[in-house]
Amino acid sequence: MSFQTNYIHLADEILSGKTSISYEQALEILNSDENWWEIYAAALYLKNQVSRNNIRLNVLLSAKQGLCAENCGYCSQSKESTADIDKFGLLPQNVILKQAIVAHQNGASVFCIAMSGTKPSKREIEQLCQVIPEIKKSLPLEICLTAGFLDREQLHQLKQAGIDRINHNLNTPEENYPNIATTHSFKDRCDTLERIHNEDIDVCSGFICGMGESDEGLITLAFRLKELNPYSIPVNFLLAVEGTPLGKYNYLTPIKCLKIMAMLRFVFPFKELRLSAGREVHFENFESLVTLLVDSTFLGNYLTEGGRNQHTDIEFLEKLQLNHTKKELI
């Protein structure tokens, strides 16, 4: 593909508020070849002009696992999955609080509580609304919750309890959605994000790349999410879990994953772009390059899949001279 856009100039125009990236320019990034490293340099320049070498650390707690009535093809917790995972109800409040303390001591700024299922029960919401203030009172942590298709009343209760952010990913382009899940729709996810916004709670929403989406579909999805004005954008790359419909699915290359992140850096220049699940698998020797492009990442494990040892993560970030909250790991 011939080189058409001067991306350093585009980055300067974005920083000055004069323009934003177009659909065509985003597609040019994904299709780039001989000019690719110039584009990467421009994306890195854009990131550094906004947030320098700072990176925020998130820790994820799987607080309720398995037992889900949804049929998401990527998920080991869905009703269709035969993956060998532990299944349990909502963890006791003292266990959640203890894990929040560990997250803080290990340097996290954000504690992410994840619950499987379509949406929480009344009792589960009550439990969350008890433990959230306890965490906020004890620790300087932001709390993000992922708990399915929360209704307006549940969101209001969580807002009153002090929740900082709700995660609800769009996951995959609308045209690809029926290939991934049929127990709910892409519109259901968009409607949930609208309800979160209406309660004046910050939105965390992103993608799972590598589930059969086209380049054009992924860019359309990114621009659709931009309209919904998320606070943070977690970008996952499919962890193909044995026992799920997508358990043997993998067509992404490390360079394609890096191009996706560079494209998203341009689409979301002033938002918190987060490197999430799959980074250890998909980027191979490019992991340092992608880490330099983002504003935050996860320490340790994901939901049912193990990540990297937290000490190793911290050492990796320090070798890159990225500024994170430096606390003694326990």
Curated annotation (Swiss-Prot):
Enzyme Commission numbers on file: 2.8.1.6
Provenance organism: Streptococcus agalactiae serotype III (strain NEM316)
GO biological process, alphabetically ordered: biotin biosynthetic process
Catalytic activity: (4R,5S)-dethiobiotin + (sulfur carrier)-SH + 2 reduced [2Fe-2S]-[ferredoxin] + 2 S-adenosyl-L-methionine = (sulfur carrier)-H + biotin + 2 5'-deoxyadenosine + 2 L-methionine + 2 oxidized [2Fe-2S]-[ferredoxin]
Function (record text): Catalyzes the conversion of dethiobiotin (DTB) to biotin by the insertion of a sulfur atom into dethiobiotin via a radical-based mechanism.
Note on how the cofactor is bound: Binds 1 [4Fe-4S] cluster. The cluster is coordinated with 3 cysteines and an exchangeable S-adenosyl-L-methionine. Binds 1 [2Fe-2S] cluster. The cluster is coordinated with 3 cysteines and 1 arginine.
Pfam families per the UniProt record, alphabetical: BATS, Radical_SAM
Keywords assigned: 2Fe-2S, 4Fe-4S, Biotin biosynthesis, Iron, Iron-sulfur, Metal-binding, S-adenosyl-L-methionine, Transferase
Assembly and oligomerization: Homodimer.
Signal peptide span: none
Protein name listed in UniProt: Biotin synthase
GO molecular function: 2 iron, 2 sulfur cluster binding; 4 iron, 4 sulfur cluster binding; biotin synthase activity; iron ion binding
Radical SAM core domain boundaries: 53-276
EC class: transferase
Pathway note: Cofactor biosynthesis; biotin biosynthesis; biotin from 7,8-diaminononanoate: step 2/2
Binding site for [2Fe-2S] cluster: 112, 144, 204, 274
Family: Belongs to the radical SAM superfamily. Biotin synthase family.
Annotated SMART domains: BATS, Elp3
Top-level taxon of origin: Bacteria
InterPro entries: Aldolase_TIM, BATS_dom, Biotin_synth/BioAB, Biotin_synthase, Elp3/MiaA/NifB-like_rSAM, rSAM
Residues given in the record as [4Fe-4S] cluster binding sites: 68, 72, 75
Iron-sulfur found in the keyword field: yes
Required cofactor(s): [4Fe-4S] cluster; [2Fe-2S] cluster
